[in-house]
Curated annotation (Swiss-Prot):
Membrane topology reported for the UniProt record: Single-pass membrane protein
GO cellular component: extracellular region; plant-type cell wall; plasma membrane
Protein name per its UniProtKB record: Protein CADMIUM TOLERANCE 1
Gene field: CDT1
GO BP terms, alphabetized: cellular detoxification; detoxification of cadmium ion; detoxification of copper ion; response to cadmium ion
Length: 55
């Protein structure tokens, strides 16, 4: 038989979605914006999350 898959870390998008579900849209958008601020660049993932976090 096959072994169970190893635990995987949550992706960035999944993390933002979880924040949106737990704390609301505004928190998720601020979390995403601060992530880009901390890494000093705007990445595609951040833009996608900002556009989609309120859906």
């Amino acid at each position: 038989m096959y072994n169970a898959p190893m635990a995987q870390d949550m992706s960035y998008y999944e993390h933002v979605q979880r924040r949106h579900e737990e704390k609301g849209c505004l928190y998720a958008c601020i979390f995403t914006a601060l992530c880009c601020f901390c890494c000093y660049e705007t990445c595609e993932c951040c833009l996608d999350c900002l556009c989609c976090c309120c859906n």
